[in-house]
Amino acid sequence: MLARFPLYLRLIRMDKPIGSLLLLWPTLNALWIASDGHPAPSLVVIFVLGTLLMRSAGCAINDYADRDFDRHVKRTAERPLTSGKIRAWEAVAIAVGLALVSFLLILPLNALTKELSVVAVFVAATYPFMKRFFAIPQAYLGIAFGFGIPMAFAAVQDTVPALAWMLLAANVFWSVAYDTAYAMVDRDDDLKIGMRTSAITFGRYDVLAIMLCYAAMLGIYVWVGVTQHFGWPYWAGWAAAAGCSIYHYTLIKDRERMACFAAFRHNNWLGGALFAGIAAHYALSAL
């Protein structure tokens, strides 16, 4: 069992934290905004751990769902499940176990948060299968990656206001942007095996679609800043995030595989800039 532990860590992408960070930033944004910059430490711990656990569970179930496809994709052919180093039932067991631990974390929270968690688990578990049917599965991914947003508002305010759904919409646009760049890396392989991705759907308009999604996401955050009366620290963070999106254009415009992958990874800085602006606004407002 101990000898297989490194394989399990690879299955849940513990060696690749970028996915966890892309989930974490929008969740932290929601926690800070919902609590006016003063989230309870216990809530921060619960949502950070829950995000990490559910992302790991999602990786395991994704590899289970895609195991017959991944062996035909250069980037994924050596994943533990695809290469036969672990079995399908092990991946399912790990995913279920991580989801159960994540649910245990929210037991102290209110009923609305628990109800939303059921929806969150359903969306996360079904996302890998959406790639067979949806032309832009990355939009579904945005809902799965962003469901911590309404849950955060529910945990703090015991309601989910329109603001939370706007933040979730922003996350959908952001997810389509960064995951389309990611899908551009695998586009040739995905075309051969019949996988549906936004990079394939957008075709020669892929770069334009990515930049429009960035613009939509940043536009929603302008609305958030105006309606919440955020100060200059927020707008500095917003400007840094906008600068990141422009930098990503320079990486993806020639559609070179490794540059597209670099753009995907760099979205961590875009998300971090927005959260830094939100946190700094509340911190300075409290002085």
Curated annotation (Swiss-Prot):
Record's keyword annotation contains Amino-acid biosynthesis: no
Key words of the record: Cell inner membrane, Cell membrane, Magnesium, Membrane, Transferase, Transmembrane, Transmembrane helix, Ubiquinone biosynthesis
Listed EC numbers: 2.5.1.39
Cited Pfam families: UbiA
MF annotations from Gene Ontology: 4-hydroxybenzoate polyprenyltransferase activity
Its membrane topology: Multi-pass membrane protein
Annotated GO CC locations: plasma membrane
Transmembrane intervals: 30-50, 92-112, 133-153, 158-178, 207-227, 232-252, 267-287
InterPro entries, A to Z: HB_polyprenyltransferase-like, Prenyltransferase, UbiA_prenyltransferase, UbiA_prenylTrfase_CS, UbiA_sf
Catalytic activity: all-trans-octaprenyl diphosphate + 4-hydroxybenzoate = 4-hydroxy-3-(all-trans-octaprenyl)benzoate + diphosphate
GO biological process, one term: ubiquinone biosynthetic process
Subcellular location per the Swiss-Prot or TrEMBL entry: Cell inner membrane
Cofactor: Mg(2+)
PANTHER family xrefs: 4-HYDROXYBENZOATE POLYPRENYLTRANSFERASE, MITOCHONDRIAL, PRENYLTRANSFERASES
Family: Belongs to the UbiA prenyltransferase family.
Task performed by this protein: Catalyzes the prenylation of para-hydroxybenzoate (PHB) with an all-trans polyprenyl group. Mediates the second step in the final reaction sequence of ubiquinone-8 (UQ-8) biosynthesis, which is the condensation of the polyisoprenoid side chain with PHB, generating the first membrane-bound Q intermediate 3-octaprenyl-4-hydroxybenzoate.
Protein name, per record: 4-hydroxybenzoate octaprenyltransferase
